Amino acid sequence: MSITLSDSAAARVNTFLANRGKGFGLRLGVRTSGCSGMAYVLEFVDEPTPEDIVFEDKGVKVVVDGKSLQFLDGTQLDFVKEGLNEGFKFTNPNVKDECGCGESFHV
């Protein structure tokens, strides 16, 4: 089981953590939301809980709760710039369908 980051995602997370001045790593998860059922959760974490699973890729610690891991296993996180927009992009091999707006997905 794993979650990986592209070079650009790792660089962006490290920049955010440095600007923040503290932090253990990046928490990834899923929550019930949208028309397709699930949405990604991405936030910085100062300390993992005992129930968390911690991965490390390209020097970034990625924290995932056990319930979310089944939906995120094999996911790659990228940071992309498209025109004037930029943001994190998830490539998740478990996704079966996404809503039209791209805000939620179904596995």
From Swiss-Prot:
An example Gene Ontology molecular-function term: iron chaperone activity
UniProt superkingdom: Bacteria
Gene3D superfamilies the record matches: HesB-like domain (2.60.300.12)
Matches recorded under PROSITE patterns: HESB
Keywords assigned by UniProt, alphabetized: Iron, Metal-binding
GO CC, one annotated term: cytosol
Pfam name, any one: Fe-S_biosyn
Cofactor(s) required, per the database record: Fe cation
Result of changing C99S: Loss of iron binding activity
Entry binding sites for Fe cation: C35, C99, C101
GO biological process, one term: iron-sulfur cluster assembly
HAMAP family, sorted: Fe_S_insert_IscA
PANTHER family xref list: IRON-SULFUR CLUSTER ASSEMBLY 1 HOMOLOG, MITOCHONDRIAL, IRON-SULFUR CLUSTER ASSEMBLY PROTEIN
UniProt similarity note: Belongs to the HesB/IscA family.
Note: 2 iron atoms may bind between dimers.
Oligomer status and interactors: Homodimer; may form tetramers and higher multimers.
The protein's name in its UniProt record: Iron-binding protein IscA
Organism name: Escherichia coli (strain K12)
